[in-house]
Amino acid sequence: MDDQLKHMTGQVAKGTMTRREFVGRAAALGVTAAVANSMLANHAQAAAHEAPIRGGTLKIGSSGGESTNTLDPALTASEVPLNNLRHLYESLVEVDPNGEIENRMAESYEASADAKTWAFKIRKGIQFHNGKEMTPEDVLKTMQRHSDENSQSGALGIMRGIENMKVDGDNFIVELGVGNADLPYLLADYHLMIQPDGGMDNPGAGIGTGPYTLEVDEPGVRHGFKRNENYWDADNRGHTDYNEVLVLNDATARTAALQSGQVNMINRVDPKVAALLDRAPNLTVKSVAGRGHYVFIAHVDTAPFDNNDLRLALKYAINREEMVDKILRGYGTIGNDMPINASYPLFDESIPQREHSIEKAKEHYAASGHDGSPIILRVADGAFPGAVDAASLFQESAKAAGIPLEIKREPNDGYWSEVWNKQPFCASYWGGRPVQDQMYSTAYLSTADWNDTRWKRPEFDEMLLSARAELDEAKRKETYSKMGQMIRDEGWLILPMFNDFVDGVANNVGGWVEDPNAELSNNKAGIKCWVKDA
């Protein structure tokens, strides 16, 4: 039995068996769920504590890169820029794979009893890449820049909840109008990377405190990073001499690059080839469930999308189970037109699942009074793997309901700068956030810069603020439930599926840690992993 369990834990690590399957099969062998989960945790911990090897070059093949990309953390919106941020910069705190807060530029933090005032003690002796020592003033200026209404920062919605910020000795102080026990999670947002003088003068310079310094910056092509020899946490990050991120937006090209040894790891393995790729010699497919979701979004302030009956018609028309089966190939779960799933704390499982119903789609489409002109949906596989095929499935099911959905395929390059958040109806992707407050504050608060559906409801904003201040978890959960149902029934988010994060990794890579926060081990694989044959 021991050999069988050992083999099964290895399958979970490779992503060929889910945790649920492991627990079920272990139960058949007489192992309790508690013991089974402990075995998985011990296996992951042992892998994570493998002795690092210093030196060598690590190459990452990643989708989500464009010629318009910048190194300004405020403007980061896709995977390649996010990977770059992890190499160059660090935030006050981070969220670890277990969902706990990990201190980075902050050495410690504490809050007042009402969670309105927070003090983050800033580490001493940490240098930026330009030799300047990081100070609490750099932290303050960074946060002030992201609070500027003209910053276009993806964290602007988060920062609007802050009334005042200041420096007090070694501490960065945050004062809130409404208490928020989740504030550290909000400040872990990847846009809030600490820069010298807050990045006020040159936010795209690439100068941070991270484990690597910038060597090559060719947006849309490649980015190169050299190990920072003065890095403060060298025992845990920055093991390789050099890292390179290659922009490979085409899924077939990414897979070929991994198979040929051109790169050591890739993100967003096409689910159609995942099982086949995992059988290839010297390669492993890593899969972890999380909060990422593939979506179709429209602007509620633009006709004909300002009609809720039309919105509901399309929501009932889409066949979620078909998409999970055919697009995700089982690497995910069905969605419910709200960005929250069971991976989130305080999720309400009693919210009814919206079912595929052609009859209801027809009823709502007729009630919408739409004139029958083509409804244009813009897509590219750069939005998410299989987006074009998913749109085709959507088009067919909409056709069955008499809805004239027309697909317009856009180029991958420029999709995130020219289509997303600009065109009124398109495919999109969200990686999710650690807590509900952050997800809602980033994309659904009326004043959020990344409110990509333009859905604005004062009553929703009020509920978000009241949930922040609510210390009774049952009441907080009830408020979050109402908010989720508002988006589900009134918003312009069509969320057919939550995706697993599916990555491909060469077996000569060590230090991989399963992280449900985002793909490529929360985009930290490049800074935490090493090359075994360096």
Locate the predicted segments by residue.
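Extracytoplasmic/peripheral linker and loop segments enriched in polar/acidic and small residues
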Residues: 400, 404-415, 441-507, 533-534
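N-terminal lobe/hinge region of extracytoplasmic solute-binding protein
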Residues: 61-113, 144, 207-209
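Ligand-site clamp/hinge motif
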Residues: 230-276, 395-396, 404
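Structural transition elements
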Residues: 334-367, 384-389
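Gly/Pro-rich hinge or "lid" segments in bacterial periplasmic/extracellular proteins
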Residues: 96-100, 187-244, 250-252, 358-359, ...
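N-terminal secretory signal peptides
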Residues: 1-21
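Long beta-strand-rich cores associated with HINT superfamily self-processing modules
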Residues: 505-534
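Surface-exposed binding/hinge segments that line
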Residues: 121, 154-197
